[in-house]
């Protein structure tokens, strides 16, 4: 069955999401968050949600941002490695808390630990980043965006 391409059917709504994501990226840069940290969030959320289109897109973006195949490969088990910085670990905690919000709220102690490694602006922007990629995952999955073989 052919799915409704939500990005085209409701183009103005989709454009608003794109604009929101662009604003998050711009403000994140101002707040000292690298594109690589944002892409880690994008990739981890996409792994959890099982969005093939976004996994393909954000694994490439992470490599382009200078990350390694090794770190991408172990990202689902990031807690079991020493390959991620404290800032990245805090970002990944936020990504997972937002994505699994019905199951895994950050308690006050966990939230306090995040703030040892992130500024208020960074916490806010990483949360917005996780919110926006969760929305994009859902659009991509519901629309069944294809992943085409690379040549």
Predicted regions and their residues:
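Hydrophobic alpha-helical segments
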Residues: 1-151
């Amino acid at each position: 069955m052919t799915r409704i391409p939500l990005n085209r059917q409701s183009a103005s709504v989709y454009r608003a999401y794109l604009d929101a994501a662009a604003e998050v990226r711009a403000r994140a840069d101002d707040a000292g968050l690298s594109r690589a940290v944002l892409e880690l969030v994008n990739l981890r959320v996409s792994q959890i949600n099982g969005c093939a289109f976004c996994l393909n897109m954000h694994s490439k973006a992470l490599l382009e941002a200078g990350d390694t195949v090794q770190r991408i490969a172990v990202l689902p088990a990031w807690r079991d490695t020493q390959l991620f910085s404290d800032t990245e670990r805090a970002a990944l905690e936020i990504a997972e808390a937002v994505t699994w919000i019905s199951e895994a709220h950050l308690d006050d102690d966990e939230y306090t630990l995040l703030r040892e490694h992130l500024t208020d602006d960074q916490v806010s922007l990483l949360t917005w980043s996780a919110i926006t990629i969760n929305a994009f995952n859902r659009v991509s999955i519901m629309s069944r965006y294809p992943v085409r073989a690379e040549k």
